[in-house]
Amino acid sequence: MEEVEATLMKYMTFNSSCSYAGIANMLERHGLDTSDRSIAIGMKLPYLFFRCNGIYLSGPMLQEAKWFNLYLNPIGYELSEKMMPADEAAAYLKAQETAMLGIRTGNTGKHAVVYTGTRADRLVFLNNKWESEEAPDEIQLTVDELKQKLDPTVVVATLQQVSPKSVSFTDKLQESIAGLAQSFTSLQQELLCALRQEPEQCILLNENISMDRLQTSAQSYAVL
């Protein structure tokens, strides 16, 4: 699709919020004025904590559609994600009005950018960045240049307008509580190992052990 000029660039206002600023930029192209911070607050980001494949995720590291839709669904939008080989991404993007994906940027890992259209033989992306950052607001890439900046398999997110629907935070908050409990157990285990100063004798704690027992155990080892 041909490039559609955005009326206002939405910048990052907190660390690692490029995908959140990206959602704000996509909504801007639909005529909605919001910000990365408003999105984070609207989806109750400070209270979300998730454990996936043994890794604890929170804050702006929660970047999947299921998290963003906590904010988007009530205002009548939904984010969808499509996985595809890198060499199919350019053609897919050209069929969209706007889309978001992660590209490699030097040694800083992946960075979320928003596709806005084409200019001559280049795909044009909004560079979700800090306003004070010395980097261009736009990134223009040929098809080959884009492919070089993508992982072999890429996830492209698109935004669709839907009927507004309410969302329940109950399940997500319960998941957060469970994740925090698991994190606490892991932390206590590391604490006990450190207090013993004998890693080979590290006690493997049961995930269901009570907080009182953990605290008592830690206090006991503290006097050894």
Please report, for each region that a protein language model flagged, where it lies by residue:
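Alpha-helix capping and helix-coil boundary motifs
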Residues: 35, 84-85, 168-172
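A generic N-terminal leader/anchor concept
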Residues: 1-34, 194-223
